[in-house]
């Protein structure tokens, strides 16, 4: 899952709100 997390972070542009971004990505999934 590490690669997926990395890809997600790269997609959002390494935003400071990682937790929020993960929640948004999880919702989109």
From Swiss-Prot:
<keyword id="KW-0618">Plastoquinone</keyword>
<feature type="transmembrane region" description="Helical">
    <location>
        <begin position="1"/>
        <end position="15"/>
    </location>
</feature>
<keyword id="KW-0521">NADP</keyword>
<keyword id="KW-1133">Transmembrane helix</keyword>
<keyword id="KW-0150">Chloroplast</keyword>
<keyword id="KW-0812">Transmembrane</keyword>
<comment type="function">
    <text>NDH shuttles electrons from NAD(P)H:plastoquinone, via FMN and iron-sulfur (Fe-S) centers, to quinones in the photosynthetic chain and possibly in a chloroplast respiratory chain. The immediate electron acceptor for the enzyme in this species is believed to be plastoquinone. Couples the redox reaction to proton translocation, and thus conserves the redox energy in a proton gradient.</text>
</comment>
<keyword id="KW-0793">Thylakoid</keyword>
<keyword id="KW-0874">Quinone</keyword>
<keyword id="KW-0520">NAD</keyword>
<dbReference type="GO" id="GO:0009535">
    <property type="term" value="C:chloroplast thylakoid membrane"/>
</dbReference>
<keyword id="KW-0934">Plastid</keyword>
<keyword id="KW-0472">Membrane</keyword>
<keyword id="KW-0813">Transport</keyword>
<comment type="similarity">
    <text>Belongs to the complex I subunit 5 family.</text>
</comment>
<dbReference type="GO" id="GO:0048038">
    <property type="term" value="F:quinone binding"/>
</dbReference>
<comment type="subunit">
    <text>NDH is composed of at least 16 different subunits, 5 of which are encoded in the nucleus.</text>
</comment>
<protein>
    <recommendedName>
        <fullName>NAD(P)H-quinone oxidoreductase subunit 5, chloroplastic</fullName>
        <ecNumber>7.1.1.-</ecNumber>
    </recommendedName>
</protein>
<keyword id="KW-1278">Translocase</keyword>
